[in-house]
A protein has these predicted regions:
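Non-catalytic C-terminal accessory region of glycerolipid acyltransferases
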Residues: 63-212
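Catalytic core of membrane glycerolipid acyltransferases/transacylases, capturing the structured
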Residues: 2-61, 66-67, 77-94
Length: 212
């Protein structure tokens, strides 16, 4: 499963895992792939590993897919989760297409997923880059409540969430193209465009981010 990434912290990953477990007929467990930084943070690393998460690299992705696991990845990475609120729901660049290569090598279908709701929980108004560099973080967000309210600023705003699972994109006929840069680029672009269009549909269904 390939989703858009947003919301300052990876709350969308948690919500996607819950949605998959609750909506899948067999209550499948989603194995999430995370950035190296996640596994260098003491508490977060432990929680992520206990929930079945692993480092986002092709070797681990292919190993999980070969064993029939359901794998979740967010190709935008920190570019998506740390973007400003003014750029909400505008997909960022999809890295080098590693998720496509892993899917092709294992013949695994790619399921694009659009997630609406994360952008509003911690709206990023500014990024204090000097402080982020000092703390060795990809960004240091300033939101309407953080850091002004201290720990209270970490409480997420109550946005309305919508998640759409798009039709799977088959890859079984493209196994021999796993090393073809053009095939990888085109397929990654197809996934990205599918998610972007789904986001537009969801936003039309949810005109008020905090409405019920």
């Amino acid at each position: 499963m390939v989703g858009n990434h947003s919301g300052t912290v990876a709350m969308d990953a948690l919500m996607l895992s819950i949605a998959v477990h609750d909506e899948h007929p067999k209550a499948r467990h989603l194995r999430l792939l995370g950035a190296d930084l996640v596994f260098r943070m003491p508490v977060l690393s432990e929680l992520t590993r206990k929930s079945g998460g692993t480092v986002a690299c092709n070797a681990d992705a292919e190993r999980l897919l070969h064993t029939g696991e359901l794998v979740g990845v967010f190709p935008e990475g920190f570019k998506g989760v740390g973007k400003h609120y003014r750029d909400r729901y505008k997909l960022q660049r999809f890295g080098r297409g590693g998720f496509v290569s892993a899917a092709l090598r294992t013949g695994t279908p790619i399921v694009p997923v659009a997630i609406v709701g994360a952008e509003e929980i911690y709206p990023i108004l500014a990024d204090l880059k000097p402080l982020a560099r000092l703390l060795k973080l990809p960004y240091f967000p300033v939101t309407p409540t953080f850091p002004w309210l201290g720990p209270l600023g970490l409480v997420p705003l109550p946005s309305k969430w919508l998640i759409e699972f798009c039709p799977p994109i088959p890859t079984a006929d493209l196994v021999d193209s796993a090393d073809d840069p053009m095939v990888i680029f085109n397929l990654a672009d197809q996934v990205r465009e599918t998610i972007q269009q789904a986001l537009h549909r969801l936003l039309e269904r949810r005109p008020d981010p905090f409405g019920r």
